[in-house]
Amino acid sequence: MPARVDIGRFAKKAMSVADKRVEIQLGKVGALERIRSATGFDLAGYERVLDNYGVRHTMKQHGSQAQELRRGQIAVTLDDFGLIPLITAEPDLILHDGKNKVGRDVIVFAKTIDGIGYRHVEEIRSGKRLVVTDSMRKKKGAWGS
């Protein structure tokens, strides 16, 4: 599993790549029993991945302090992506959140760290046995279901 600083460095690099997919592997999916119990999905053997599309989407949709303030949230920073392993390994909440725009099932992992609630959304790519970052948000306090 890459270190937090390496993931943050990847996220910074990912912002400059729009014409092709680049990714960093974050390791095998853990918390398997909790995921299965909360969502019904068996992700044994799946790999967790962060790619430039997830980084770019998150920063475009949730990276503006002014926009997030209007939503009652806090802007995501590139360094926040380094928290993904912690958020997904020891989440406070896991839930299935339906399907995304391309029809893939999505799972939400929420965790409060130092008073900040992180909501990390991943899509399941069953054919390739991957879970890939779809989006991330953050706010003061915990996220509810």
Put a short name on every predicted segment.
Residues 1-145:
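Ribonuclease/tRNase effector modules and their secretory precursors
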